Amino acid sequence: MSEQNHPQTEPQLDENQIIALRREKLHNIRQQRNAYPNDFKRDSFAADLHAQYGEIGKEELDPQGIPVKVAGRMMLKRQMGKASFATIQDVSGQIQLYLNNKGVSQEVLDDFNHWDLGDIVGAEGTLFKTNHGELTVRVSGIRLLSKSLRPLPDKHKGLSDQETKYRQRYVDLIANEESRNTFIKRSQIIQSVRNFMVGEHYLEVETPMMHPIPGGATAKPFVTHHNALDIPLYLRIAPELYLKRLVVGGLERVFEINRSFRNEGMSVRHNPEFTMIEFYEAFSDYERMMQMAEDIIRNASRTVNGTANITYNGKEVDLESPFERLTILEAIKKYNPHYTDEQLNDAEWLKKEIVKHGESLPPSPGIGSLQLALFEGCAEGKLWNPTFIVDYPVEVSPLARASDTKQGLTERFELFVVGRELANGYSELNDPEDQAERFKAQVVQKDAGDDEAMHYDADYIRAMEFGLPPTGGCGIGIDRLVMLLTDSQTIRDVILFPQMRPE
């Protein structure tokens, strides 16, 4: 807004004084009229006006007198003699308003001059361009639609306090265009994933959020109580077992995008409630699921970024090339070539090496569990470009189908990008007797103190006994996918209202 001379700012008052002053203004408005009218009808968005008229020259645009009605939050306001300029912001962007006593009455102008930054206004008028070429609405009528009682963050400093950003996301969205764009992209990513699944002839379904038995993943659940039934219920840690029941029922391709809950720690990549997609396909296997995961992620990147070659934290990530595939042991040796096969199959050596890398020993320290723990300590964080880690041990994969050719391993994968897990999938175990034995082994682990071990789910076994077709399944963390595709460094930046300690 180069025409303006001096921006209008709040008096040099503290926040409480500013709020008190604004409340007084609101009281005065209430004495005269409805302070919160709801009859202004907007017909234009800022971005649409810029797209349609932004390239038209002043000489061509001004004589047309194109009428518009716009509405939004006042972000800038400046007076220049008998005229005033303001910038309002709607969901699509910003547009400038111009008021003078030729377009509106002096009473309206005086009223406008008492309004504050953050107020929500509706204006009508005609489009023109300033001498500096800025598309502007020459206002013929303007109304205050909602009074802002609290001051916005400083225009130049923005909302810099991270905790305030997360606690008061509404202020963050007002003040920070980058945050708004991140959450717009999040919505586009989810829509891209949904469209892709529908294009693959999958049926979107909804399964329970409260489970009588927690299952579908190894994690600690949140527990609640149903008063009428007088039973404990568990917020779901994964929808897997219900989705596979649907495959038993003949819904051969199903997916669900929804929340899951895990009563675990919080970090830059963990929030107690999170969004994921899980999908299952009959007459499929983990090879098909790996290709599906690869295609979903690549397609989402192209949709929101226009390319599958992106940058994360200043470093390139190649989502375009076929994703690499390694076993757990291959990944360990890739980054630690001095390790020998003998060492990697020695339980005592593995335990010492795990501790050396700062990892905790697994609750059930079989060779497979120990190898996985070492992988997490010495290799996982180095997997920058997308890499499928395949063929997980049976003991850490209680729902995955055992390999026909590799003793003690399963047809399971996890996908890692920028050093963190993004997806998990496998050929589903569809032998009910084998599944029952694995559930029993999980119960033994739980009795030994492993809070994350699974319960025995008798109804799921009953469903399997009707016959689960050969099936592939996969889960992808939506929050982590959004982090990757928006170059966000913490999960809190991509969840609108992340879990916080109470104030």
Curated annotation (Swiss-Prot):
It is found in: Cytoplasm. Pfam families: tRNA-synt_2, tRNA_anti-codon. Mg(2+) 2 binds at residue 421. Mg(2+) 1 binds at residues 414, 421. One of its GO terms (cellular component) is cytosol. Keywords: Aminoacyl-tRNA synthetase, ATP-binding, Cytoplasm, Ligase, Magnesium, Metal-binding, Nucleotide-binding, Protein biosynthesis. Its cofactor is Mg(2+). The keyword DNA repair does not apply. PROSITE patterns: AA_TRNA_LIGASE_II. Binds 3 Mg(2+) ions per subunit. The keyword Glycoprotein does not apply. One of its GO terms (biological process) is lysyl-tRNA aminoacylation. GO terms for molecular function: ATP binding; lysine-tRNA ligase activity; magnesium ion binding; tRNA binding. Its EC number is 6.1.1.6. InterPro entries: Aa-tRNA-synt_II, aa-tRNA-synth_II, aa-tRNA-synth_II/BPL/LPL, Lys-tRNA-ligase_II, Lys-tRNA-ligase_II_N, Lys-tRNA-synth_II_C, NA-bd_OB-fold, NA-bd_OB_tRNA. It catalyses: tRNA(Lys) + L-lysine + ATP = L-lysyl-tRNA(Lys) + AMP + diphosphate. Belongs to the class-II aminoacyl-tRNA synthetase family. Homodimer. NCBIfam families: lysS_bact, PRK00484.1. This is Lysine--tRNA ligase. It comes from Neisseria meningitidis serogroup B (strain ATCC BAA-335 / MC58). The lineage of its organism: Bacteria, Pseudomonadati, Pseudomonadota, Betaproteobacteria, Neisseriales. The gene is lysS.
